[in-house]
Amino acid sequence: MRVAIALDKDDATRVYPGPFGHAPRYAIYEAGPSGELVLLEIRENPYAKAHGEEKHAKMRELLRDVDLKVGARFGHKGSLGAFPLADRVEVGPVSLEEALARLKERSSA
């Protein structure tokens, strides 16, 4: 399973505090069979400043290989966002380390 975590624009050790789709980049991890998460890449988000349904389609394409999206929050100005509720986890504006710990707890539950 692949996981994308929204990264803060100024501090790559923190989750981006705004809507998931506005994050400037994502840490892409592969979850192993025993729950370990291995960083595969840092992926830039060229659509961070875009808005609307067209952006949603572009975001789905950008993260088409990702199974679970992790961010501080999802949706913007009444929109539920580009991704189904089942495919995302809200963690709040926490450290990357805290977000990873929550994912590990979730996978062992």
Show where each model-derived region lies.
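Non-catalytic interface/targeting segments
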Residues: M1-A57, D65, R88-A109
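Mid-chain, well-packed structural core segment of small domains
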Residues: K58-D87
